[in-house]
């Protein structure tokens, strides 16, 4: 059957072609005949034109002849007149008659014109008579030409008739050809034939209508409308053309012109019941949103013609209308009727999509999901179905899954990236995940594609509101209201914005406007009732509570804004649907959207991993970006690619923080291992040295002691490491708690002065303070958001907490690195502190950037730039920590090696007794162990629970000012001059004083006696240590009782010190005058006594250091040291006259007063400490900065000068020159009183916490004037050695601990030089000195331990007081003032 049909069709096509060929032949014959006729007519016309030309030439020749004859006649007449005038004049012979004749002639001449006129007329009459026959001739000629002209007109009429027929024939031929081409389906050839027809007749209505209909079929509605408009100008009463024109305007979205065209069609049509016309009118009403009128129009079409060609399309549109009207059952009936016969160009998948959406609106989510999945089986890239499934997984409470929702939406974007609705829904999904940066990017893409959708701007305002950018939220809400002021949701969101800033009057206005637009919304009504009750102060009933937003009014948390539901798909007209059924129209439908479940309430503060996402560009930047859409597609691709990857910047930041923590732990472990290795090396070196000297017994005792010390050191280090980790965690939790408690204050104060209206939040009685707010406006920068106000803001408090938090963490890190520095010198210690300070600064910047409120006018690129800065800062911190660790390791290794080498060389150069070797080893080991304990104590004290708390703001300021003042001291020109003068005086003393060198060897017998006594003393010391060790674990209650008593004494002591400081400032001027006189007197005495007999001077070690890394000059330091093995008879008066420097007298006067107070306190403390000791003694020991001096019964003086070359140079610090040291040993004779006790060099007299800044400045001024050691540091010698001058180098205190002055710590080089000098001097000592030195050293060590324990207790008490004051300040600052919002909602209505 199919073959026969095809054959028949082919035969029919062949017949049609033959018919067309015959018609073409006939048309060609007709055209040839018409062409021959035209040629003949043209020849006739040419002949007639030649004849007419000949006749015209003949007539012109006759006219020329007549004109020539007339000219000749006129000349003859003129000659005759002249002859007559000559004859009329008489001859005048007589002179008398001449006058009369002249008069007469004049009279005649006057009369001549009158007399001559008639003859002239007579003369003129003949030419007129001659012209009459000429006119007659012309008339005759014209009469002869009239038949010729008539013939010509007749011929022209015939020609025009022929040409018109030819045009009509051509027009009809081209129209027939166009119709035939259109029937075949070749629309382009049909258009060309119709245009050729218009060339022959530009007013051909048939050709114009056919061209317009073809353009309408091609959906080129603009061109179709042009041709229909040309037809209407020709025939203004054509109703069908008006209807077609209205349909074209409807497809062009020009609804107003479409409406007027449909009106003209109804007026001019003879029968207005045209189904096509009412079909177009129904679409027009659908576009306007008047669904009732559209329903009437579509039902009227079906009544007019049951078999209307677009009936299925009308069923589809009625189903969509019923869905919008809420008639879901009727809508499902129409859609199910169309499943088997969908209207073109729709498919069954599009119908199932609409069915699934209806089920979704009925909240039958499982049926809806099944319908959507059916669509995906047929078409896996259906963009609208993927969009709706993503939204279903987003808001459906039964199977909510944001990851699935985002996945479906991204697939929808892959298939159709131009749909703004999909980008909008993607932003909503990111909002629920609190990924605000991604949500912002998605909303931005939606606004790029549809910038006049108020729904998008409302959601952008909600985004800004959630991240507390209130100004930008206000801008977005106002933009949405300008686009559509009849959305109740936007007004409600605006009310929540006002309410969050406690501007209740404006909030009430916004809520009232929302209630007017949506009076049936219970949520708005309840919120309005609760707010009115809060303003009026009336109690709120159960019905007035807003459970979703908190039951405690404004203290229950900020209310959550209402979100507008996105428009349903498929609401547009049928012509807006593409091949796949995608509807890209996102109209708002006049606010007929329903509410959806609100977002969960988000805390005002963000977690650490989300803080980088909180800083977004402002609404102004978003508005400016809409103008430039060059990067629209690129940004969409970037957004799509960023979905499948995490934020690399945030991950890198977290990795950097983890690396820092790991490095800190590794540093602590390495430090412990290095400490153990160093101690083992010391033990090995001691064993080798003792084996060489054949002293097995002494070696065993030393090894036991060292093992015991090493075990304690390992315990200290382990405890310190554990406390490092615990305190870091505690600080972290404390910091989070502080930020959480203060965040609400920041949010309210940060945006003070947002709106234009100057209002304040109402007080308890509901009154406004509008005048006061004008004085409290913020002059803040748009970038960093800093408040320039006199009072302390909550933002300042958060900055302080972050700074303290970072300082504590960095201090812990620096302490863990300091535990490794057993033998570091002063320069290395300062370098480590400087590096730690750099780390503090970098981390402070990072902390402030993370926790500060969001700026309202950030650059879009600031987020990437901030990430780069954070990464660079972390890299710098890691490099600094690595450098510190390497420097510390190198210093330890070099110092240990140098010490071993120097000892070995010293033993090989001379023969020493076993006692000397043992004493050297003991001294060296004590130095190493004491230094280790010193640094461990520093770490433990800094890591104590009290120190982990935050510092007070006042203390931070004082610390910063003290550091600045001390640095300015070292750089001041006055101190530089004093340093030069001291150097000159030291050089002069060296030249004057003779320095005899001792080369005698000790007797072997005396040495053997001393060794026996020494071994017995060592055993006693061990026993005492064992007894004291269990007593060190006393209870903490006894410690607190002792600290309370000591606290009262310290207060009294501090008051006395303050009084003394005031007195000393007044006496400074007098002392300066006395200095000059005393210098001259002392110099004269020293010269005279040195000439009488050589006196051996006290050992002074002066070191001149170059500038350190920071370029600060350090003064030459002089330190004194006793040699217990030396004994020479001297007198105090002689020693007072042999002072090596000029500042001895000043120092003695300043120190005597303080020493008297110290001796009294120490005597009382010794009694208490003998019975009970602190528990902290078993865990940590106070650092030993210098050896103390004790009273002895006999005194000896020896002198020895050596020049020591530097043995080690730090890689990081600046290279120092050769240090010249002069060492002399002295011992003074003094009576041993029961009240006397050794002084403490490391004790610091700190001012009370309530001490004013003026008192601290006075002490600093005093230090500058007198150039003596700071009054905060106690003297380093006893009253008996007051004349021994010491000028410690003034250096800035460590930021970790103020109580450990850097100027008093000894470098490894100096310690080695001291140990060598002590060993050299011991060769000339006697046996008695050994016994006395051992007794004094044992007592001194006990005293030192007791003093250290007391100082620890004092530190703990001070920190407790600081904590109490902080708690008081926190209670005062719990209720900060709220910030107002300025412009009212009433201005937005304008």
Swiss-Prot record:
Q: Looking at the record's lineage, which domain of life comes first?
A: Eukaryota
Q: Which InterPro entries match?
A: Corepressor-Demethylase, TPR-like_helical_dom_sf, TPR_2, TPR_rpt
Tell me the ranges holding the TPR repeats.
Answer: 171-204, 206-238, 239-272, 275-308, 312-345, 349-382, 384-419, 420-453, 454-487, 489-521
Any one Gene Ontology cellular component term annotated for this protein: nucleus
- Identify the stretch(es) annotated as Disordered: 53-143, 539-596, 632-938, 958-1390
GO BP, sorted A to Z: regulation of gene expression; sorocarp development
Q: Where is the composition biased (Polar residues)?
A: 1136-1146, 1229-1239
Q: Which Pfam families match?
A: TPR_1, TPR_16, TPR_19, TPR_2, TPR_8
Query: Which Gene Ontology molecular-function terms are recorded?
Result: chromatin DNA binding; RNA polymerase II cis-regulatory region sequence-specific DNA binding
Does the entry feature the keyword Repressor, yes or no?
Answer: yes
Q: Which UniProt keywords apply?
A: Nucleus, Repeat, Repressor, TPR repeat, Transcription, Transcription regulation
Q: Where is the composition biased (Basic and acidic residues)?
A: 540-557, 632-641, 745-803, 857-871, 977-993, 1000-1029, 1037-1099, 1120-1135, 1147-1169, 1206-1218, 1240-1263, 1339-1374
Q: Where is the composition biased (Low complexity)?
A: 582-593, 644-744, 805-846, 872-898, 917-937, 1170-1180, 1192-1203, 1219-1228, 1277-1289, 1315-1337
- Which cell locations does it reside in? Nucleus
Q: Which family does it belong to?
A: Belongs to the CYC8/SSN6 family.
Could you describe the subunit structure of this protein? Associates with tupA to form the trfA-tupA corepressor complex.
Name of this chain's protein: General transcriptional corepressor trfA
Where does this protein come from, organism-wise?
Dictyostelium discoideum
Give the organism's phylogenetic lineage. Eukaryota, Amoebozoa, Evosea, Eumycetozoa, Dictyostelia
């Amino acid at each position: 059957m199919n073959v026969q049909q095809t054959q028949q069709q082919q035969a029919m096509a062949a017949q049609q072609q033959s018919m067309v060929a015959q018609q073409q032949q006939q048309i060609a014959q007709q055209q040839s005949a018409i062409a021959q006729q035209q040629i003949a007519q043209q020849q006739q016309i040419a002949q007639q034109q030649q004849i007419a030309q000949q006749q015209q030439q003949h007539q012109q020749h006759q006219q020329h002849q007549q004109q020539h004859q007339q000219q000749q006649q006129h000349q003859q007449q003129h000659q005759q007149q002249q002859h007559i005038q000559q004859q009329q004049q008489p001859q005048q012979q007589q002179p008398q008659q001449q006058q009369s004749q002249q008069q007469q002639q004049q009279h005649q001449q006057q009369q001549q014109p009158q007399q001559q006129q008639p003859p002239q007329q007579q003369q003129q009459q003949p030419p007129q008579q001659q012209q009459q026959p000429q006119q007659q001739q012309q008339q005759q000629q014209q009469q002869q030409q009239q038949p010729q002209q008539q013939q010509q007109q007749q011929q022209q009429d015939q020609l025009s008739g022929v040409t018109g027929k030819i045009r009509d024939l051509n027009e009809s031929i081209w129209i027939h050809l166009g119709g035939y081409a259109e029937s075949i389906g070749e629309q382009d050839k049909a258009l060309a034939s119709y245009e050729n027809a218009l060339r022959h007749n530009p007013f051909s209505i048939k050709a114009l209508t056919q061209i317009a209909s073809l353009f309408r079929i091609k959906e080129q509605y603009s061109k179709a409308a042009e041709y229909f408009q040309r037809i209407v100008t020709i025939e203004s009463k054509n109703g069908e053309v008006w209807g077609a024109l209205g349909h074209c305007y409807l497809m062009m979205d020009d609804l107003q012109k479409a409406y007027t065209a449909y009106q003209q069609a109804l007026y001019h049509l003879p029968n207005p019941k045209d189904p096509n016309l009412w079909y177009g009118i129904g679409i027009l009403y659908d576009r306007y949103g008047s669904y009732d009128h559209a329903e009437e129009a579509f039902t009227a079409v079906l009544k007019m013609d049951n078999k209307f060609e677009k009936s299925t399309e009308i069923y589809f549109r009625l189903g969509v209308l019923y869905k919008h009207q809420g008639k879901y059952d009727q809508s499902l009936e129409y859609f199910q009727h169309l499943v088997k016969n969908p209207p073109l160009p729709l498919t069954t998948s599009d119908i199932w999509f609409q069915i699934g959406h209806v089920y979704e609106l009925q909240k039958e989510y499982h049926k809806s999901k099944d319908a959507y999945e059916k669509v995906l089986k047929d078409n896996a890239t259906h963009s609208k179905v993927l969009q709706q499934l993503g939204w279903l997984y987003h808001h459906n409470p039964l199977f909510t899954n944001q990851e699935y929702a985002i996945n479906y939406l991204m697939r929808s974007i892959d298939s159709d990236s131009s749909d703004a609705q999909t980008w909008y829904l993607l932003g909503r999904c990111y909002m629920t995940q609190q990924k605000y940066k991604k949500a912002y990017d998605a909303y931005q893409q939606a606004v790029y594609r549809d910038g006049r959708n108020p729904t998008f701007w409302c959601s952008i305002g909600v985004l800004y509101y959630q991240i507390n950018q209130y100004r930008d939220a206000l801008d977005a809400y106002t933009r949405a209201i300008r686009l559509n002021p009849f959305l109740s949701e936007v007004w409600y969101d605006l009310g929540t914005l006002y309410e969050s800033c406690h501007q209740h009057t404006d909030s009430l206005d916004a809520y009232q406007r929302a209630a007017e637009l949506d009076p049936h919304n219970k949520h708005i009504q309840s919120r309005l009732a609760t707010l009115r009750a809060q303003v009026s102060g009336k109690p709120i009933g159960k019905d007035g509570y807003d459970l979703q937003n908190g039951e405690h009014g404004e203290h229950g948390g900020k209310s959550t804004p209402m979100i507008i539901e996105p428009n349903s798909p498929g609401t547009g007209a049928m012509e807006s649907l593409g091949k796949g059924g995608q509807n890209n129209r996102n109209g708002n439908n006049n606010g007929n959207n329903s509410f959806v479940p609100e977002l969960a309430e988000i805390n005002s503060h963000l977690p650490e991993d989300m803080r980088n996402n909180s800083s977004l560009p402002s609404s102004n930047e978003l508005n400016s970006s809409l103008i430039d859409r060059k990067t629209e597609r690129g940004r969409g691709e970037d957004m799509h690619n960023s979905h499948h990857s995490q934020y690399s910047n945030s991950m890198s930041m977290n990795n950097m923080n983890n690396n820092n923590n790991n490095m800190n732990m590794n540093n602590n472990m390495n430090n412990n291992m290095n400490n153990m290795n160093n101690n083992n090396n010391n033990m090995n070196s001691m064993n080798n040295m003792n084996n060489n000297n054949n002293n097995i017994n002494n070696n065993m005792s030393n090894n036991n002691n060292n093992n015991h010390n090493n075990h304690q050191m390992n315990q200290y280090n382990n405890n310190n490491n554990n406390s490092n980790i615990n305190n870091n965690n505690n600080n972290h939790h404390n910091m989070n708690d502080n930020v959480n408690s203060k965040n609400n204050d920041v949010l309210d104060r940060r945006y003070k002065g947002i709106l234009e209206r100057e209002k304040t939040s109402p007080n308890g009685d509901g009154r406004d303070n509008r005048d006061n707010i004008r004085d409290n406006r913020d002059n803040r920068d748009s970038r960093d958001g800093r408040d320039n106000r006199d009072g302390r803001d909550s933002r300042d408090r958060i900055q302080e907490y972050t700074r303290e938090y970072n300082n504590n963490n960095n201090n812990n890190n620096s302490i863990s690195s300091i535990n490794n520095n057993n033998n570091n010198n002063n320069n290395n210690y300062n370098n480590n502190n400087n590096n730690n300070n750099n780390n503090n600064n970098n981390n402070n910047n990072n902390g402030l950037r993370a926790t500060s409120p969001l700026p309202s006018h950030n650059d879009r690129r600031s987020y990437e730039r901030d990430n780069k800065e954070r990464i660079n800062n972390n890299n710098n911190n890691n490099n600094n920590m690595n450098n510190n660790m390497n420097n510390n390791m190198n210093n330890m290794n070099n110092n240990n090696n140098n010490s071993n080498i120097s000892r070995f060389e010293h033993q090989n150069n001379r023969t020493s007794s076993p006692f000397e070797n043992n004493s050297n080893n003991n001294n060296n080991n004590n130095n190493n162990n004491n230094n280790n304990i010193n640094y461990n104590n520093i770490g433990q004290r800094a890591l104590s629970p009290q120190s982990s708390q935050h510092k007070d703001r006042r203390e931070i300021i004082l610390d910063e000012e003290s550091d600045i003042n001390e640095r300015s001291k070292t750089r001041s020109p006055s101190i530089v001059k004093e340093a030069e003068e001291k150097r000159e005086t030291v050089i002069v003393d060296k030249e004057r004083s003779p320095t005899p060198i001792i080369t005698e060897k000790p007797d072997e017998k005396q040495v053997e006696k001393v060794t026996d006594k020494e071994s017995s003393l060592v055993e006693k010391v061990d026993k005492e240590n064992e007894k004291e060790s269990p007593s060190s674990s006393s209870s903490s209650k006894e410690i607190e009782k002792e600290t309370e008593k000591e606290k009262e004494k310290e207060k009294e002591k501090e008051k006395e010190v303050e009084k003394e400081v005031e007195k000393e400032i007044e006496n400074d001027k007098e002392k300066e005058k006395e200095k000059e006189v005393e210098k001259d007197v002392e110099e004269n005495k020293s010269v005279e006594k040195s000439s009488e007999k050589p006196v051996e001077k006290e050992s002074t070690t002066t070191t001149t250091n170059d500038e350190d890394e920071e370029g600060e000059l350090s003064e030459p330091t002089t330190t004194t040291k006793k040699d217990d093995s030396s004994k020479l008879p001297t007198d105090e008066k002689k020693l007072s006259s042999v002072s090596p420097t000029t500042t001895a007298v000043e120092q003695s006067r300043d120190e005597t007063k303080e020493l008297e107070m110290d001796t009294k306190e120490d005597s009382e403390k010794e009694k208490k400490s003998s019975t009970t000791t602190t528990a902290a003694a078993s865990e940590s020991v106070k650092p030993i900065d210098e050896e103390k001096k004790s009273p002895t019964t006999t005194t000896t003086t020896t002198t020895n000068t050596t020049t020591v070359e530097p043995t080690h140079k730090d890689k990081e610090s600046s290279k120092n020159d050769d240090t010249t040291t002069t060492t002399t040993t002295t011992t003074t004779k003094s009576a041993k009183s029961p009240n006397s006790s050794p002084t403490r060099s490391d004790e610091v007299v700190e001012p009370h916490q309530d001490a004013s800044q003026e008192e601290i400045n006075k002490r600093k001024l005093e230090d500058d004037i007198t150039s003596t050691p700071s009054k905060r540091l106690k003297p380093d010698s006893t009253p008996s050695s007051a004349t021994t001058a010491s000028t410690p180098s003034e250096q800035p205190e460590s930021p970790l601990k103020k109580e450990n002055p850097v100027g008093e710590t000894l470098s490894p080089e100096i310690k080695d030089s001291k140990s060598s000098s002590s060993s050299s001097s011991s060769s000339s000592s006697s046996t008695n000195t050994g016994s006395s030195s051992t007794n004094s050293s044992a007592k001194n060590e006990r005293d030192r331990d007791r003093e250290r324990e007391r100082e620890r207790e004092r530190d703990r008490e001070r920190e407790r007081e600081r904590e109490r004051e902080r708690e008081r300040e926190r209670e005062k600052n719990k209720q900060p003032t709220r910030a107002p919002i300025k412009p009212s909602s009433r201005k937005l209505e304008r």
